[in-house]
Amino acid sequence: MRQKELEKWLKIVIIAVALCGLVVCAVAIPWIGHVLIAPDPQISDMYIPWLVLFIISAIPCYVILYLGWRVAVNIGKDRSFSLENVRHIKLASKIILFDALYFFVVNVCMWRIYVNHPGVILALVFIVFACVVVSVVAAVLSHLVVKAADLQEQSDLTI
């Protein structure tokens, strides 16, 4: 696959993920919240804190999509193994980890003030674990891109 074609497909995927995230945050989460509180008005106090939690947690996801867009642009310019991409991927790794920890800490705090269910905390452990795995994979990828950039630089100097 050529660089420009790869850039195009990456951008299409990033746009699709951004639109799906927008639908989830603007439509699905509020709708699910209303469905859950309809049978039990006692839990209606939990709706707004949960909605705010999800919206705040979505912001870092869009920052990561922006960083992915920047990486795609660099790939299109045939700068796949550049230090700029390393910085973007490393920053994305840190943001993923921060978002997972934020989500976990806020959920535990909400559980402590009785705005959350212990079962949600249990399910959240798996979500946080998946985020940590993705963060580690991104960190490893940034390390490999550094090595590839060094090799490419050495190759360019020897020719």
Residue ranges, per PLM feature:
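Select subsegments of transmembrane alpha-helices in polytopic membrane proteins
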Residues: 14-18, 90-100
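Membrane-helix boundary elements
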Residues: 38-64
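Alpha-helical transmembrane segments of multi-pass membrane proteins
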Residues: 19-33, 135
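Alpha-helical transmembrane segments and their membrane-interface junctions
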Residues: 99-119
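Alpha-helical transmembrane segments and their immediate juxtamembrane interface regions
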Residues: 122-153
